[in-house]
Amino acid sequence: MPVTPRQPYGGDLVFTAFSGSHQDAINKGFDDLNEVAARTDKNVDDVTWEVPYLPIDPKDIGRTYEAVIRVNSQSGKGDIAYIMKTDHGIRLPRRMQIEFSKTVQHVTDSKGGEMNSKQLWDLFSSEYLDRAEPLQRIDHSLATADNGDDAITATVLWHGKECEISGTGNGPLAAFVDALHELDIDVSIIDYQEHAITAGFDADAAAYVECEVNGIPVHGAGIASSINVASLCAVVSAVNRALTELDE
C-alpha cells in the first residue's frame, strides 16, 4: 500500500522543509542544540529537543536528517551552510555563504529541481577549489627575513608558464600576497578564516579569504593537509575567480 509523502511518520517527506525560511530556522535550531551540548558538557542526543518545524527528533523513530533540508531555488544561505557543514565539514563564513547561495540559486533556477549533497559539493569544488587558471601554486618554501618577517619563495604556474616569485610579510599569507606583486597581481585581504575539517576528507584544514584582487571583491577557499598550504590555495582561488570574472 503506498504511503503519501507527508504521512506521519513514514512518508518520505514528513520531515522535509522546502521553504528557505523554514530551512534556515531548522538550521539555527540544530546550531542551538550543539551550543547547549557544548556549554553543558553533554552529548547532543541528551539535550532537550527544541528545533523549529520538527516536533520530534527524526532519529527517535529511525529516520535520518538527510531529508530534512532539500536544496532548491527557495533555499537560503543557512540551509546550504548546514549541509556543507554536516556532510562535508566545511564551515563557510557568513558573507561567503551569501555568495555561494547565489551560485546555487542560479543553478537550481536554470536547471530546475533540487541539488543533493554530492551535487552541492561538486558545485562548491568547481567554483572555489578546482580552478587552476591563470594561476596555480606548485610549491613554496618559508624562511625568516632579517627583520623577523616571514619570507616566501613560491613556484607557480602563471598562464601556463612556470616561474618563481618571492615576498615578505607578517606571516606566510601576507608574504605570498607580497610575492604576487611580481605578477602584477594586487591582493588586499579583507577577512581570513580557517578551521580543521572534521568529516569526510583526507585533508584536515580549510581556509577562506575575502579580498579584493586588482580591485575586484571576491572570495576564495583552499583545502589541504597543512593550514599554510590551505591559506595560499585560498588566495590562489580568489585570484583565479577574480581574473576569470575580469576576462568575462
Language-model segments: which ranges?
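Terminal-proximal interaction/regulatory segments of ATP-powered molecular machines
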Residues: T168-P172, E210-P217, L232-A234
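Positively charged, aromatic-enriched nucleic acid-contacting surfaces
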Residues: I152-V156, I197-G220
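Long, charged, glycine-rich C-terminal linkers/tails
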Residues: I190-A196
